[in-house]
């Protein structure tokens, strides 16, 4: 790495790992590798996102977590069709209660929301997030 830095003079080359194609492919296709698991999660997220009109670039977007450093909550779209992207930004498990003007119109049972990424069901008033977890909630 230092050799490529000294040749190019570009700081970005200092810590850039050089991959061998065969090694990289074997890691990516190995079901137990973190790279494979991460790639599957990213593919799933992109597939889900491509199907949701709420994630259209022109769709309304609002940050509901202003002033917080532990969680980011982004509301996409308006009304009962809204999707709430909730990101735990910490290495700790946290609990969160979602409050938004559109919620009273759609809360009607205990498990009233679903994560579009995993199909896990939640209650708007008691959302538990693992460290660095991301969920995309919509009403059931």
Predicted segments, located by residue:
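Loop/helix patches that line or flank the sugar-binding groove of alpha-linked glycan CAZymes
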Residues: 1-83, 89-95
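C-terminal beta-strand-rich structural cap/linker in extracellular carbohydrate-active enzymes
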Residues: 120-140
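A broadly conserved detector of short glycine/acidic/proline-rich loop/turn motifs that flank catalytic sites
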Residues: 25, 77-78, 90, 100-102, ...
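Low-complexity, intrinsically disordered short peptide segments enriched in small/polar/basic residues
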Residues: 68-69, 86, 103, 131
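Beta-strand-rich binding/interaction modules
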Residues: 93-117
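Short amphipathic beta-strand/extended segments with alternating polar/hydrophobic composition
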Residues: 74, 85-87, 122-128
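Generic detection of short hydrophobic beta-strand segments and adjacent strand-loop junctions
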Residues: 19, 96-98, 122, 127
């Amino acid at each position: 790495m230092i050799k490529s830095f000294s040749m190019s003079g570009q700081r970005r080359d200092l810590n850039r790992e050089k991959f061998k194609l065969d090694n990289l492919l074997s890691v990516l296709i190995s079901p137990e590798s973190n790279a494979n698991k991460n790639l599957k999660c990213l593919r799933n997220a992109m597939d889900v996102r491509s199907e949701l009109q709420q994630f259209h670039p022109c769709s309304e977007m609002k940050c509901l977590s202003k002033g917080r450093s532990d969680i980011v909550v982004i509301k996409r779209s308006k009304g009962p069709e809204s999707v709430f992207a909730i990101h735990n930004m910490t290495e700790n498990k946290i609990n969160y209660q979602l409050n938004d003007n559109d919620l009273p119109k759609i809360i009607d049972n205990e498990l009233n929301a679903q994560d579009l990424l995993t199909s896990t069901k939640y209650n708007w008033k008691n959302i538990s997030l693992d460290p660095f977890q991301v969920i995309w909630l919509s009403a059931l």
